[in-house]
């Protein structure tokens, strides 16, 4: 049975009695209880992600991210992996390909599932799939049959979402998911105010995403909608890695760290997922170094 909790996905999948019993024993508080308490004025201790890797620069951050993904593949060669399209991930992909060529990791049995994709583009040559084929799938020699993509031309896009979900469910969840964070805190194309309980879905893009997304297209592009793995999948992923780099991400990084988990800032879900880590460089973490000292 899938969780129907109106607050957030949890490992008890709607078995509230078991959740309450666990929290009595541990002295902890479930997120749903925490949310109600905060709405009534209680001051709760600040939640932190499970693990944060603070790296000196972009190169070190990229290498750490690559190592974390490849470590999962070494332990499970046929792992199901989800990777993000985007310029900040290029060096991570280069390192992963270098490691494969050096025999340090083998992707021949690894399977991949698309994180997200733009919809309604006039020219799809520079979409997410095009980026991934150019910068990772092609160089790494990943066969097409090992890649699950959203059918962006389907007449029934909800059915296309369910088809991808079924691939993930059949695997027992994604084994490792690498993410970047948007300037508005989005993960994949899970925009602000995304429902944490949803799996794959079609989304209307936030104005920030419409604007910032222009950088991925040579001649600009009208962006209106997207399709994405939902945040619920992240709760059922073996390892979720959020990489955040550059001084331009310092503001959203501070919001993520200094906010309670909230659907207003999707990236705060990293404070809730069972196996979530953040990999960041000092530029992005400049405003939260005081918090990182205690993790």
Tell where the protein language model's regions lie, with residue ranges.
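ATP/nucleoside-binding phosphotransfer catalytic cores, i.e., glycine-rich phosphate-binding loops
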Residues: 237-295
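Class I SAM-dependent methyltransferase SAM-binding "motif I" and its flanking Rossmann-like core
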Residues: 184, 188-231
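Cysteine-centered metal-binding/redox modules
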Residues: 1-43
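Ligand-binding beta-strand-loop-alpha-helix segment within the catalytic cores
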Residues: 44-51, 105-176
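Glycine-rich beta-strand-to-loop/alpha-helix junction loops that act as flexible
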Residues: 83-88, 179-183, 245
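A glycine- and small-aliphatic-rich helix-loop capping segment at beta-alpha/alpha-beta transitions
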Residues: 95-106, 130, 192-202
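Glycine-rich N-terminal segment of FAD-binding domains in flavoprotein oxidoreductases
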Residues: 75-101
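N-terminal glycine-/serine-/threonine-rich phosphate-binding loop
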Residues: 40-81
């Amino acid at each position: 049975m899938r969780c129907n909790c109106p607050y957030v996905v949890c490992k008890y999948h709607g078995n509230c009695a078991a959740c309450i019993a666990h929290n009595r024993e541990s002295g902890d508080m479930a997120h749903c209880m925490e949310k109600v308490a905060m709405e009534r004025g209680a001051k709760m201790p600040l939640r932190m992600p499970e693990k944060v890797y603070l790296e000196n620069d972009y190169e070190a951050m990229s290498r750490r991210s690559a190592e974390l993904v490849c470590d999962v593949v070494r332990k499970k060669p046929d792992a199901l992996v989800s990777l993000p399209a985007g310029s900040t991930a290029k060096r991570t992909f280069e390192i992963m390909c270098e490691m494969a060529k050096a025999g340090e990791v083998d992707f021949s049995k690894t399977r991949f599932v698309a994180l997200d994709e733009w919809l309604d583009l006039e020219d799809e040559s520079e979409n997410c799939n095009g980026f991934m084929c150019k910068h990772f799938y092609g160089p790494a020699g990943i066969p097409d049959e090992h890649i699950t993509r959203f059918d962006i031309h389907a007449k029934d896009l909800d059915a296309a979402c369910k088809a991808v979900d079924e691939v993930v469910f059949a695997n027992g969840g994604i084994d490792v998911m690498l993410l970047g964070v948007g300037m508005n805190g989005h993960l994949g194309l899970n925009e602000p105010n995304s429902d944490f309980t949803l799996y794959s879905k079609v989304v209307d893009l936030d104005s920030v995403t419409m604007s910032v997304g222009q950088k991925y297209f040579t001649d600009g592009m009208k962006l209106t909608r997207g399709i994405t793995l939902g945040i619920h999948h992240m709760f059922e992923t073996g390892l979720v890695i959020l990489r955040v780099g550059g001084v331009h991400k310092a503001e959203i990084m501070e919001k993520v760290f200094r906010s309670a988990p909230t659907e207003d800032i999707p990236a705060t879900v990293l404070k809730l997922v069972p196996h979530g880590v953040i990999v960041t460089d000092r530029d992005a973490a400049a405003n939260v170094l005081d918090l990182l000292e205690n993790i």
